[in-house]
Amino acid sequence: MALVFRTVAQLAGVSLSLLGWVLSCLTNYLPHWKNLNLDLNEMENWTMGLWQTCVIQEEVGMQCKDFDSFLALPAELRVSRILMFLSNGLGFLGLLVSGFGLDCLRIGESQRDLKRRLLILGGILSWASGVTALVPVSWVAHKTVQEFWDENVPDFVPRWEFGEALFLGWFAGLSLLLGGCLLHCAACSSHAPLASGHYAVAQTQDHHQELETRNTNLKH
């Protein structure tokens, strides 16, 4: 039973971490962190991401323009770029490390403890990747809400709203956190069968020694 739980936890943890990493990469590059709908022209919509701003028109389609300067960006977008890059890198390392700790990859019976440590390290990296993905999307969402309800801005001025990439980033961060938790559960459960195995071997050896002692006494 413990073996089945460990295998399921490992596969589910790696799968969720992989899903979260892919979604965090998409969140990083999609230009849909903010949406702006113009009341005067309903056929024209604006979107903003970490790297570019796009305008969507029914006749022309989507046209995007990269930001000219990194320093000219708002603080939340500058920090979000760095954190999202960090999240993508940590998520990739977490997948790589935890992959070597899976039971389906045979690296020798004497290296069970090493595989357990790899799963723990992979879980920690997935956690870090999830946190560094949740922080930027939550920060941008918070600033968007503040600007939307800013009383100093006239009512006729269009306001930015949540884009699809923010929800994608939240889902990515939660998937990475849950994947890291499952990897830790798998690592903790992988220690118990090993200990019980050693106990069974020791108990068998004691039984053999007891039988040998009885046979010796009968001969005498």
Curated annotation (Swiss-Prot):
Positions of disulphide bridges: none
Q: What is this protein called?
A: Claudin-22
The UniProt entry lists membrane topology as: Multi-pass membrane protein
Q: What Gene Ontology cellular-component terms does the record carry?
A: bicellular tight junction; plasma membrane
What are the protein's GO molecular function terms? identical protein binding; structural molecule activity
In the record, biological process GO terms are:
bicellular tight junction assembly; calcium-independent cell-cell adhesion via plasma membrane cell-adhesion molecules; cell adhesion
InterPro entries attached to this UniProt entry: Claudin, Claudin_CS, PMP22/EMP/MP20/Claudin
Q: Which PANTHER family match?
A: CLAUDIN
**Is the Cell membrane keyword given for this protein?**
yes
Q: What does the UniProt function comment say about this protein?
A: Plays a major role in tight junction-specific obliteration of the intercellular space, through calcium-independent cell-adhesion activity.
Keyword vocabulary terms for this entry: Cell junction, Cell membrane, Membrane, Tight junction, Transmembrane, Transmembrane helix
Protein's UniProt keywords contain Cell membrane: yes
Q: Spell out the subcellular localization from the entry.
A: Cell junction, Tight junction; Cell membrane
Q: Give me the Cytoplasmic side stretches, as residue ranges.
A: 1-10, 103-117, 186-220
Give the Extracellular membrane side ranges. Answer: 31-81, 139-164
Query: What protein family does this chain belong to?
Result: Belongs to the claudin family.
Name the gene for this chain: CLDN22
Residue ranges annotated as transmembrane are 11-30, 82-102, 118-138, 165-185
**Which top-rank group of organisms is this from?**
Eukaryota
